[in-house]
Amino acid sequence: MNRSYRIQPPWHPIQVLLWSAALVALGLARNAACDEPRFVDHSLLVAPEYPCTWPSHPFPRFAIIHSRTIGPESAYNIDTLLIDGNTGTQLDVPPHSVARPELKREKSGPLGRAYTDKIEPWQFGGEACVVDVRDLLDKAPKGASPLVRPEHVARFEQQHRPVRFGDVVLFRSDYSDKYYRPLPEGRRFIADILDRKAPGYPDPDPDCMEFLGNRGVLTLGTDSASMGPLPDLAEPTHYAGLKYGMIWTEGATNLKELPPTGAFYCLLGPKHEGGPYGEGRAFSVVGGDLPRRLIESCKNKRAIDLSPTLSPKLPLTSPGIGTGEHRQTYLKVDFLYSEYLDMWHHGHFMDATAGTHLVPPSYALPADDKPVPYAPEVRGWLEDYEKKYGKRGVSRRTTEQVPIEWTCGETRVIDVRSLVGSTKQSNWPASPEITVEHVQAYEKTAGALRHGDVVIFRTGHVDRHLRPSPADAGLWLDPLQGKAEGWPVPGPDVIVYLKDRGIRCIASDAPDLGGVDPRRALMTYWALGSREMVGVEFLVNVDKIPPTGAYFLFAAVKVRDCHAGPGRAIVLY
């Protein structure tokens, strides 16, 4: 007998009720899941074997150098980066094409000074309006770009709504999703187009930029390698948009995860001084009430920049305690001069902890359980640590593996400035220690910490001491050499307590979370990494954060195998 035609007995009423209840519960669970915000990464992986840099001479190739690894010479994994602003997912700002006003060129204007360190943080984000141009993919001759025209945006507007100020208009062709691959296959991403072996990536023409500029749109994005159509419209398109004060993402990816409207989109990147462009990290927030809240903050220009400007004039990296222990200083590397803009295109050679940066678990933890040949002194510290806090963990979680949602959340600022001046000079070098009692005192007045909150310790140290030479000793050198008190830092007991409270990210407006005592610092980082927590160090402007209603956003550049990560922190309120 064919089993599919067997007559089934009628259902019992209780069975019907049980199935109905189960279906209702399933529907409620699905609705609850839809109400939860979801973070989506839209950034390309930066790694030497990927086509992450512009392939033409003399643009520098990306490089990561593992300067120190955990072992006899170092208790930390320390990386140095050679990176320029045309690397991976990136940001373009007006001076890319707009000349400074004093040059009196045809394209001169005040926006010629709107470098990456001058853009207001509200402009980095907004409501994603995804213009679907997948029908243009590969629809052009070799070496030429299919053109996104005003009618493509008009088509979006007919289907959804008019674009406007506060929107981030994103051109989705799925180009990077299809062609960003390890080399040599990855030559198709840019190099094969320049060599006229393949069609170009879709991009807007100048008329499309004029259309958007007249709509009041100031932020764009594309999942193409550049916003400039090849072979001869790259500069006209750039200037057509940048003259309005636009900024945009180049090299976005994974735009298929976004609805046509309603999601919050943002790109954050290191705050390089005088940068006409910059490497960055793009992400979105989809679902629940959070996207609308963040969109409204950006639209109403309620944003605070928490990252200092990165400049070779400033002491952005640790000079170390002893000779030879300093980190790579932050250097600007010029490689191509533009006579029209009177500007050097440039990259940077820097330690991965320069300025505001991420501390992932792998910074202080070895990758596996193999015995680590620590220096004898450090072995003693490890024994002391494990007696009190349990076995030190291991981790392979480098920067690119840290979910963006780990470094975003409701802001909880704990003011610890009362600790400044609390140590005895005879005990220097020493940092005042933030204790569990300090955190609990905060909770009594401000309410209990909640899962997913971002705790920021306000010390005031970077704001007070970040100065160019010769006034630069107060930030690092004097405290490390015992000539001044160190900055307040959390001890490992606080890390354990915050983990129990559901905290994943701890931030500070001090140079680091470890302080000037190397033993205590290492224990803090061991505790942090062993509990799968992360740090964000070197903030500024924490005093400007409102006491309630502020949302913290930080994202590090998506560099593979990096044991720290430069990035940008902002607050939206």
Where on the chain are the PLM-derived regions?
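Cleavable N-terminal signal peptides
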Residues: 20-21, 32-33
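Bacterial N-terminal signal peptides that target proteins for export
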Residues: 2-18
